[in-house]
């Protein structure tokens, strides 16, 4: 939306500067994209007069123009087709920079002839995107006068971005009303002189679809002189980019930009029989039409080969469909309602009698027709954002008065009208309490009422409640929040006090839990896992393989038949992903998910669930790789549990809790802490794999993060890892122990046996068989020994071996295998 400062001041009494107005517009939600001051760039251009012309002796398309300027006569070579003697033009003197092209004018020799300046076109001055010749000024222009002042370019232009809900801001009057409410000035009252009709129009009006056209008004005006528009009107329209055509057309454009009400002027002598508004192929119903109206409509809608063809003002022809609303007479279509007028009935310089139309059309129909034919007009832009029906007749009167004042005191008919004004909207109960509740703004009822009244709202205060009725031009005000928004934008968003957010408590358990889960994810990602996110719903058929079905976990309104149950574990979803990957020949997988599992209606736990399958090192071109095994999974789980401040060996549950049925009975274990079950890890049962059509081993762990204790110390700084400068030594041992001793417990004991020397303990063999008693097993380990302060001697190593063997014998009744 464009408008000038002088245009705004027609409706707003203000002494505010351009900058103050621009800032206020943006503050109230009418964002100023640009303020154009063309006078600054074109200040040095002046009015000149072509006294005579003659052909260039060496170029057919050039002319030698004798130009009268402020400083005297000079010769200028010009190639414009409209350059001729007797016209006022725009002169660029030597040294001036031309905006389009950014080049400076120099005294030059063109084909042997001297040229001292340049005669300019609108395109060269960036006043139009294209032009056919040099600018021709009216006779009242004075030679030597500043061009910007004469042309009205000393009037700053505001370019604002209007949101789709603010159709009322597509008129300068609506913008002035908002600025007045903001305190930028005082809104001037519209003075509309009463129009007395001098004859009764014989033009009949028939509107068949009230929903498509809720209001249609027109009046006839006769004996006019369609002369050029006055200077003030031409300047206003030119400054906002509207081409001036004639006074009749210019007035309709002025009303559209001033009040947001599109208008159209038909040449009355070209309208035959009356006006009908209908979809172009609709048949007339006896109920809707009677008498002479029936004859008019029948003629207008009579099937003909060219009835759907429409010749528009833009020179193009369109074929209308049954979805397009047309304005017709007996001879055919005269306009595409709300979008563009027709060429047949357009006003020309010789037009003396007109039909002046102001109407409201269905916004959706206008938008659909405009999109279908790709026609962008000011009328469409305003109509598809809804028109204020209660102002339409006023706009018709204002336009009539303007036409009569410019084109002579012609004869005027009464208003021919279909439809009624929009009924008053229902009141909404608003209060200062509600405003403060949703915006934080504290205002009294009187202050709220004052703002709303300035914006045109009707208010009625009843104690602490203010009944608010939105004005007819605000179609977007339907709920209390809309009213609060209106008050807030006028009060000022910048006045709302900022509230400092409370600092996060770093000791807060929720924050610590969030950080811990994030760390778990980073740990697994660093080990090559991919994170997945799956649905919390699953098929009850799948769920019963993993847990006993419970009635309360069935969904009453599942999004699909296959998602009718709350998942008891994340594993089924991950197994489905494995199955889909295998079907696409992707065999090597490692991924995890953190999400909820549902035990019953009142129990929900957050689980970290991970799966590995396939080969570990498949991407190394120098290695065939090896298949994942349970120790790979245990190592990754150990990293996670270690970060949580626990030891994996201490978390192997020994409380007799049965493994879930979907794990392999002898290749999986529970994870727990005392009596608190934390999860499970191991190999998935072959029956489950068969159900999911998986033909390779799957290893998985499930860790109940909800039950995992938060150990504060683990979030502190870890000790710096020191690397010894002395040589490491390795010793292998094989101990015979009872079958019921857990290997992990023995390795953990050795790791802590002598922390100053033991750097690592690696298990490389477990044996039980014919050479050992049935109740015994042999475990073979490699121990890395290294001191931080010296190189270990043979005596040191022998002493360590003696002490270790004795300790194993005492702790586990183990003996060194010969």
UniProtKB/Swiss-Prot annotation:
Q: Which gene encodes it?
A: pheT
The molecule here is called Phenylalanine--tRNA ligase beta subunit
Listed GO molecular functions? ATP binding; magnesium ion binding; phenylalanine-tRNA ligase activity; tRNA binding
Positions binding Mg(2+) in this chain are 476, 482, 485-486
One Pfam family here: tRNA_synthFbeta
- Species of origin reads Rickettsia felis (strain ATCC VR-1525 / URRWXCal2)
Provide the protein's localization.
Cytoplasm
Its Gene Ontology cellular component terms are:
phenylalanine-tRNA ligase complex
Quaternary data? Tetramer of two alpha and two beta subunits.
The prosthetic group or cofactor this protein requires is: Mg(2+)
| Residue ranges annotated for the B5 domain, each copy included | 423-498
Question: PANTHER family per the record?
Answer: PHENYLALANINE--TRNA LIGASE BETA SUBUNIT, PHENYLALANYL-TRNA SYNTHETASE BETA CHAIN AND LEUCINE-RICH REPEAT-CONTAINING PROTEIN 47
Major enzyme class: ligase
Q: According to the UniProt entry, what is the EC number of this protein? A: 6.1.1.20
Q: Which InterPro entries match?
A: aa-tRNA-synth_II/BPL/LPL, B3/B4_tRNA-bd, DNA-bd_dom_put_sf, Fdx_antiC-bd, Fdx_antiC-bd_sf, NA-bd_OB-fold, Phe-tRNA-ligase_IIc_bsu, Phe-tRNA-ligase_IIc_bsu_bact
Keywords in alphabetical order: Aminoacyl-tRNA synthetase, ATP-binding, Cytoplasm, Ligase, Magnesium, Metal-binding, Nucleotide-binding, Protein biosynthesis, RNA-binding, tRNA-binding
Domain spans labelled FDX-ACB: 724-817
